[in-house]
């Protein structure tokens, strides 16, 4: 509601300024333009504005550009990596289980003296080995090759 009042005030003040300053400008400025009036245009009020129909206007058919069809899910093993993926090969576990090294590491982490040592528990599935495959991980090339 406040915006409507401000807008109305601005329109009225701009019209008042136009009428006031339009009647006080020199004669040679009134005659400049494409048309020279033998009278002051403000003397007869506002000039009529051509009416345009309100509401939605019917439009003709518009041409449609062909859209690329979305590709269905493809098997990652069938995709061939392109040359732009040459520097982004990362070997990851493709078997779906946790990979542990086949040999235990010899380095023991140092723990504070107040903690109780617990022996490491072997995870199931580690004895079965890990299958590793090359995956192209960075965004331009998210393609996995068959596991080795």
Swiss-Prot record:
Q: How is it modified after translation?
A: O-glycosylated.
What keywords were assigned to this record?
A: Glycoprotein, Repeat, Signal
Q: Which residues form the propeptide?
A: 19-43
* Segments of this protein annotated with the region Repeat-rich region: 46-75
Q: Which domain of life is it from?
A: Eukaryota
| Record's compositionally biased regions (Pro residues) | 52-73
Q: Where is this region: Disordered?
A: 52-80
Q: Does the keyword Signal apply?
A: yes
Repeat among keywords: yes
sequence repeats sit at 46-50, 54-58, 59-63, 64-68, 71-75
Signal peptide from the UniProt entry: 1-18
UniProt similarity note: To B.pahangi filarial sheath protein.
Tell me the protein's name.
Major microfilarial sheath protein
């Amino acid at each position: 509601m406040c915006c409507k009042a401000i807008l109305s005030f601005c329109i009225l003040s701009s019209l008042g300024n136009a009428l006031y300053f339009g009647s006080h400008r020199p004669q040679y400025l009134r005659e400049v333009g494409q048309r020279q009036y033998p009278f002051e245009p403000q003397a007869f009020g506002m000039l009529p504005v051509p009416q345009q129909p309100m509401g939605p206007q019917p439009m003709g058919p518009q041409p449609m550009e062909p859209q690329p069809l979305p590709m269905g899910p493809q098997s990652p093993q069938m995709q061939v990596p392109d040359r732009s993926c040459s520097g982004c090969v990362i070997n990851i576990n493709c078997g779906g289980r946790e990979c542990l090294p086949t040999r235990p590491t010899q380095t023991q982490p140092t723990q504070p003296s107040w903690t109780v040592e617990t022996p490491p528990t072997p995870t199931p599935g580690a004895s079965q080995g890990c299958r590793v495959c090359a995956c192209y991980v960075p965004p331009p090339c998210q393609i996995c090759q068959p596991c080795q």
